[in-house]
Amino acid sequence: MIGAGGYADNRWGAAASTGTGEVAIRTSTARSVILYMKMGLALPEALQEALRDLRDLRDPYAEYIALIGLDREGRHAGYTHRPNERYAYMTDAMTEPEEVKSIHISH
């Protein structure tokens, strides 16, 4: 479903979620990240706010969602309710992807 698991708008950036898709659909999680950036939040804050939206559902499966995002300048970030989550990224200047630890936010 567009806007829940993945969303992109070249004016602001892109976001994707992994985990329990039914929960991401309820809040259009990926689209929410982009909307928060449109409203003036930087990527890290937009990802955090989208995770707060999920937390406010009080759904036990919301803790399984992980978010990654990219702003229009190419800066990336990953946020999750679960400790020790990682994501990988690669730019056109790289020959191999790099794995990065996501930032953990308590659920």
Positions of PLM-derived features:
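N-terminal nucleophile
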Residues: 1-107
